[in-house]
């Protein structure tokens, strides 16, 4: 008995779609799977235009996308795990982190509709509104918003979470949030996964804190610099510091060892002079211990110190007088208003 073979007939336009997806995958070093649920067609077209300079956005039926992935390499086939609900593919030459950042920045606030589930806590802040007293007060209270009238305006009395994450938003609350211009949702292209050179990157990996990363690099560079200086390991970055440190260390050794070199003599003479003056000061109680020249030098040093002390005392007296005048002025101001 002859065996019957049945083959599924696929329309040409579907074959063309599958081939186009396969061609795009081969033409770009990176492609990603994007969620587009909840995005109006008009807004999606606008996003496609905004992306055209650095990426290609391809919207296709999930069944055709899966066929294209299944006919590609083993690495590409793994991306089938991220095909779900409303999906699009994006193809680019950008790196995964830059792509994720660009897509996140393109997201815009959007009102939540009745029956939708809150993805995070929806908060209304305490403060005045632009609404005059009227029926809206009852509408706000009916939606669970703590509203009252104050100064001829409707105000929100306290900050409150009117819907918790995971809760379904009611018709009344959805309408009132829109009137208050509170848009809890972010509408945009939701990157689910990216494939680059056989590696799959998901949002939890791509969502990096750039400021923290930069701070870590700066700290690491500083630590590496300090380590290289302490280890006396010369590099283009630290050579000036090492030379300055070596010069300072050698100068200290020469001074402590009393080495008579041109660059050291002034320091040694200054050090010897200071010691001489200290000894002279200690011996000055005996008139015969010092000659006239040394007495004169010691007197000049003493006069210089006295002059400095007098200047300091005068400055302190002026400061005290200014404080007294300020206190007196404050007292008169308090007395006469």
Curated annotation (Swiss-Prot):
> Where on the tree of life does the source sit, at the highest rank?
Archaea
Q: Which InterPro entries match?
A: Ribosomal_protein_uL10, Ribosomal_uL10, Ribosomal_uL10-like_insert, Ribosomal_uL10-like_insert_sf, Ribosomal_uL10-like_sf, Ribosomal_uL10_arc
Q: Which GO terms describe its biological process?
A: cytoplasmic translation; ribosomal large subunit assembly
Q: Where is the composition biased (Acidic residues)?
A: 310-327
Q: Which residues does the annotated region (Disordered) include?
A: 309-337
Q: Which family is it part of?
A: Belongs to the universal ribosomal protein uL10 family.
Q: Which NCBIfam families match?
A: PRK04019.1-5
* Protein task: Forms part of the ribosomal stalk, playing a central role in the interaction of the ribosome with GTP-bound translation factors.
Q: What is this protein called?
A: Large ribosomal subunit protein uL10
- Source species, please? Methanococcoides burtonii (strain DSM 6242 / NBRC 107633 / OCM 468 / ACE-M)
Biological classification of the source: Archaea, Methanobacteriati, Methanobacteriota, Stenosarchaea group, Methanomicrobia
Q: Which gene encodes it?
A: rpl10
